[in-house]
Amino acid sequence: MSDLLIKLSGSRFGAGVVKLLGMPAPVELARSAGPYAEQPLAGKNILLGRSQNGYAIDRLWQIARDAGALPLETTGVKPDILVMDATGCASPSDYRALYDFFHPQMRAIARNARVLIVAALPAESRDPVAAAAARGIEGFSRSLAKELGPRGATVNLAYVAKDAVDRLAGAVHFFCGVQTTYVTGQAVHVTSRVAAPVSLVQHGALKAKVALVTGSARGIGRATAQRLAQEAVQVICVDVPAASEALHRTCREIGAIPLLLDITGPGAPRQLADFIKERFGRLNILVHNAGITRDKTLANMQEQSWDQVVDINLSAVMAIDQVLLAENILRDEARLVYLSSISGISGNFGQTNYALTKAALIGYVAAQAPLLAARGICINAVAPGFIETAMTQEMPFMAREIGRRLNSVKQGGQPRDVAELVTFLCTPGACGISGDTIRVCGQGLVGA
């Protein structure tokens, strides 16, 4: 959707008008339009730093070189990517390494730059001081994301277990790449608890995989189906019969297979399972995107509105999973992604029913992750913030403008931004990440 402030800020005259009015001046965010490149960081100037005794630096250098990044050796050149190995921060005195690395770069960093900090897992340390030092880095990274957000730069944190350093490539490629446009101020956990695939290569890794995306006729679901199709995934697009025209149009555009189905129907899980088995045998990727809102304050909410949201957003998801997992229709090394919401993290006025279901999904993926790890299955949730869709376009003007600006990059996200994160979580390179909930919100100012 069109954002007038971005257009105005893109010209000298318009930028002056925006400044005069005291309005935020959002920058044009860098986005990818195609599939993964063989060298996702090709041509980007990268600067790497480390804390004393950091255990990830050698692997990070290797990943950067293999991805085509250019080590920054010339003064006066703006860094496109900053990567800091902070795994050696085990006491307050070690924090000086963060200051010494980042402080000189703060005025030089390029627009749409990428910052990734790698830290030790606090839970791995038996020393409370070391655990606190590792956890403190999250406060630093979130604050830095707010400082750099107005330039379109993203800052993210990857906690990595000592035995999972070899699984960092996927996180580096995504969080240092163009695809992480609207993901900033986030922390992920890279561990070895999920059985790793033979290859962690990102480029071409999803070719010929079979994916099912619910609620894919429009919006985020449609963008997700499109993005997966760009990686040569065979996509099954599911939506309700009322969305038949839009669903079939989407499927024609991307070569997907349409399936009209109300996922809350009593026989829906069985129908889905039979359809997958008859057409493909088994499934590699499952994206639970379907969901509805029925907003009212609890005092004014009807029983039907409560039940509809719980049935579609949560009960149907669990019922489908139960059948697909019980009948082994989901392959080993499958990827499961669930669309949660900022409302599930922070709550929202008039959304007690919706926030309830989206928070439940966060708990669901965290509880399922260890149960599926032995099969190499990763399960994660994605929590979008203000995303420019037909629904947000219908919001009152002031509410829409406030929603757009209440984040570090001062603008709304695009459905493609959510689809990029979903697609990354479906790759072999994301095998170290399971049980996490990652926001796609431009670091919205509400929630944790």
Model-found features: residue ranges?
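Substrate-binding pocket helix/loop in short-chain dehydrogenase/reductase
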Residues: 72-74, 94, 297-298, 305-306, ...
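Short, small/polar-rich loop/turn modules that mediate ligand/substrate recognition or access, typified
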Residues: 149-154, 182-185, 373, 378, ...
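Residue(s) in the substrate-gating loop at a strand-loop-helix junction
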Residues: 341
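Short C-terminal tail/terminal secondary-structure segment
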Residues: 184-208, 434-448
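Conserved glycine-rich Rossmann-like NAD(P)H-binding loop of the short-chain dehydrogenase/reductase
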Residues: 69-74, 233-248
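A conserved structural motif in NAD(P)-dependent oxidoreductases
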Residues: 160-168, 407-418, 429
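Active-site helix of classical SDR
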Residues: 133-137, 321, 357, 365
